[in-house]
């Protein structure tokens, strides 16, 4: 039986690359389009209650988190609520959740790579928001 894989945020560059590379290996993704106003706790609840994938890759706000020049604190707050709900839903439905991380959760003073075992020390609003996500 094949795993049901869901990709939130399939419209961004990384999402498109995953879909393309997956297709080359005969890996298909459920890639739902977000609501007009973006994913929120209610729409995520409905989506996961209806689809129940085995694993979910969350790139829903990838552009805002990693590429956009300016993102307001209000946008980050709304995204944080959505990601918290997504994590709760995945835990409740026993869905594996993959969430990209970022170097921005560290202070950047090291010359070598950081690992998930390092103590986070985010700088700026974006780094602090990413650490909470």
Predicted regions: what they are:
Residues 84-123:
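Conserved Rossmann-fold NAD(P)-dependent oxidoreductase catalytic core, especially the SDR/UDP-sugar
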Residues 23, 27-47:
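Adenosine-cofactor binding site in Rossmann-like domains, unifying the SAM/SAH pocket
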Residues 41-80, 89-91:
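NAD(P)H-binding glycine-rich loop region in Rossmannoid oxidoreductase-like domains
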